[in-house]
Regions:
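Acidic, serine/threonine- and proline-rich low-complexity regulatory regions
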Residues: 70-77, 131-134
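Generic hydrophobic/packing signal
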Residues: 80-81, 92-95, 148, 153
């Protein structure tokens, strides 16, 4: 195990046994990580809305002659909202997949679809049905996860983003999908719990 600790923080890394790795891959931990990312995504969305309203108010003041100063436009964080939303849904879907296919974590490694960022494929494998709007969100978010949510260019000029515009409605669609899939998580968890043999049974 290696350890690094200073004023920046603490980081410890080391090799895990395959058994302990499998324990850490339990679906409940995927749900927990999804919750962290869900909250962070919504915080970014809220900041975007506040920035937008502040800019509108500043422009209105300029038009009405209340100020002569040109308003500054803060750096947008909306694409990062989509990025974190994608990672949140990815964790939820992968956790549900593992309820059905725990063998996808074996020998201290993940395999197959567990290494994918394709939200449509993950949702299908997890048994999650999507509305047309949720389907569209997953397509958009999947592309953000591997490209425009993180980098200014793609890996190839042949597949490059020409324009993107994210609406406030996407935040609601994401949040409602997250809440719905979280309920599926609870159902799967209780189903699994009922299947665990009780002592003396």
């Amino acid at each position: 195990m290696t350890s690094l600790q200073d004023r920046i923080g603490t980081l410890r890394t080391g090799k895990l046994s395959p058994e302990f790795f499998s324990l850490q891959a339990d679906p409940i931990f995927w749900q927990s990580k999804a919750g962290e990312l869900h909250r962070a995504a919504l915080l970014l969305a809220q900041q975007f809305f506040e920035d937008t309203e502040a800019l509108r108010a500043a422009l209105k003041a300029l038009e009405e002659g209340q100020t002569a100063d040109l308003p500054s436009q803060p750096t947008s964080v909306m694409s990062q909202f989509v990025l974190l939303a994608a990672f949140s849904l990815e964790n939820l879907f992968k956790g549900l997949v593992l309820y059905k296919e725990p063998n996808l974590v074996d020998g201290g490694k993940t395999s197959g679809i567990m290494r994918s960022h394709d939200l449509l494929s993950l949702a299908s494998r997890a048994g999650v049905s999507l509305t047309p709007e949720e389907h569209r969100l997953c397509v958009l978010a999947s592309s953000a996860a591997v490209y425009w949510g993180r980098y200014p260019i793609s890996n190839s000029a042949e597949v490059s983003l020409q324009q993107t515009k994210i609406t406030g409605h996407s935040v609601r669609v994401f949040d409602e999908l997250f809440q719905r899939v979280t309920l599926l998580f609870k159902e799967r968890f209780h189903t699994r719990t009922r299947r665990v043999p009780q002592p003396g049974a």
